[in-house]
Amino acid sequence: MTVNMPPRLLLASLALACASTANAGQSLEQIRYTLYKDPSAEVTGDLRQLAERGDLASTLLLGDVLAARPDSSPAEMVALYQKAFADGRGMVPALASLARLIDRTPHLREAQRPWMTQALTRYPANLDPRNTSTTLEVFLTYPELVEPAQAAQLLALYEQACLLNCRPELYHAVLAERQGRRSEAERWYRQAVKVDARAIDRYYAFLGEQQDRLFPAFTDQLEPEREQLPVENIHRIAALLDSIASVQRAEQDADRYESQNSTAGAEKLPPTPEQLAREKAQQDALDLATARVQRWRDVAVARGYVPAMVSKANYMISNPTEHNAEETQALIDQVRPRDPTRAKALQAQFYMVNNWLTMDPDKARALIEELRASGYPGAGLLLGEYYSKGVEDQPDQEKALALFQAEANKGNTAAWYRMATLHAYGRALCHDPVKAYTYARVALDLGERSAKSLVRRLEKTLPKDDIERAMAARNGLFKEATL
């Protein structure tokens, strides 16, 4: 039987159906396909809806999506992963994601240790490949929570069962290190660096006190194989080398500052031949370190790897006397078709460079407002930079600090570093080296590697009492806030 529905009711029913579909959002399968097409797609709203309904797989994916964003709250991600794990009855791989988060966020390690210890007892580690690899991931972050004999057994099972994308090298390295077999561990770490980007920082840490000398030497040996390495690994190596060079530069600046202060008020004498030779040797070493960074980064840029392109563009913008506006703009133009949003952020920074004739405060502000309206995570930092540099008028450090603090409260680790630099190099009331050290340590402990150079510089210039006060303030921040 056919029912003739009046057009008005038909339109109303269609509108209701469309509204219901809109309210329902995407399914988990649709979200995964969206992320497959565009890893930076905005899907958190749909995932939150699914997670609120108790979908544990969506809860896990939401945590993973947030983990890729710089402004996400570590506390929220921890809660999502623990909810998805559901005491071992839910998504066991959530434990692996949580372990990776803790590995990137050092201050979480001790706080989460009791929970992780209990979680390991809530599922059989050798039940299937998924459980086995999850326990091995926890072993990477907490080697002491898995007995070496069990880790060796699980590693053997992993190697037997794994068919695709098998990467046992890092597990072997950590196991050998745990058992005190350092020569074997180093051999495995060197192999792991070639296949697993996470091994890069771990090998650097493994090298101990001489890491800033030994790791660059290792990368020089690796250069003949560089073209065959995964592009992510090349970029991570470049980023670590850049951090090492930044620390080297900061230590030289601190030495120069100390030397100037020690002769303040005294008759300024010309440098001795020994001083000139030492300064030349330091500058030559820094030039070599900078060239090494550029060689590695340029390979990743040539492959069209967006994070490397963004990193190089940021370097050019931060060093406008060494680069020109034309070559920087050309690089931003290459980023645009690959990642329009990040290109827009770079373009805003580009218009804030006062060394170039292309400086345009109005265009910079308009782009920042577009980014803020779209919910871009770094928009608040860009606006803070706009005020701290005084792009439109005189620098407004208080307004910049307020914006950076707001971003830090949201969980943006880079914001702590921005506050640290403003207190370290700012003028008048904003100049506060103790606060600078406090915030730089917070940033570093939250995983912001770029803060290491500022920490090292301040450690060489601040009195011991000031460092102790700064560390007490840092500890207080971690107790008071959910960082």
Q: What does each of the following model-derived ranges do?
A:
Residues T2-L10:
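Bacterial N-terminal signal peptides that target proteins for export
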Residues L16-A68, S133-T134, D212, V231-N233, ...:
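N-terminal leader/linker segments that initiate helical-solenoid repeat arrays
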Residues Q30, L61-A68, L95-T105, T135-Y142, ...:
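Hydrophobic face of amphipathic alpha-helices that form TPR/SEL1-like repeat modules
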Residues D38, P70-S72, P106-H107, G180, ...:
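Residue-level detector of the short coil/turn that links helix A to helix B
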Residues E42-R48, P74-F85, R109-P124, P148-C162, ...:
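Alpha-helical repeat scaffolds
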Residues R53-D55, R69, D87-M91, R122-N131, ...:
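Short helix-capping/linker turns of helical repeat alpha-solenoids
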Residues L140, Q349-N355, E369, Y376-A414:
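Alpha-helical adaptor scaffolds
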Residues L269-P270, S450-L483:
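Terminal, low-structured helical/coil segments at or just beyond the last alpha-helical repeat
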